[in-house]
Amino acid sequence: NEFYRPGQRLKVFVLKVEDTPKGPAVFLSRAYPKLISKLFELEVPEVSSGAVVIKSVAREAGSRSKIAVASTVDGVDPIGSMVGQRGTRVTAVINELGGEKIDIIEWAEDPEKYLANSLSPAKVVEVRIQPRNKALVVVPEDQLSLAIGKNGQNVRLAAKLTGWKIDVRSPENVDEKGIGKSEKEEGGEVEKKEAKKPAQGGSAS
């Protein structure tokens, strides 16, 4: 929810232009995820040149976003390029978006590494890939609330970013088979149960 002043200059994403009887109608958005990609293109020469590629964006506009980036050139640090010296580049984008928090993580072809990175700033102990595009992510007990995030935001954005259904657990809540203790197996498939105590774990898809 933003408030605009007359004469205020804003960067927006053009969704589409339609011809109407009264003339062209331009549909604009400040919440569209691709707006962040375009803002970084303006701020980061490595992005505009293609040396750094934005692989995925997950956004809850006005609150927080996660961006996965990768380098196409040896020796180019994708995260460092996005952040800029003393954080100048990412700060410029944050200011344009009214203070929206932005997490920049490194994309990885290996799903286990990518999933671990996506839950930053939490530290991940282990990622266990499960059937049907699900992943069980194990984090230390003291990192559990950080991995899940306030109202589940961190794990929710990580799921959107990666396209995986993520179940976050502490080591104490994972059995030797790598299954969350709030789950059960029926007919060879894992059926999730809603955890009664959010502090024990959290999932998002």
Predicted regions and their residues:
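RNA-contacting regions in translation and RNA-metabolism proteins
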Residues: 1-205
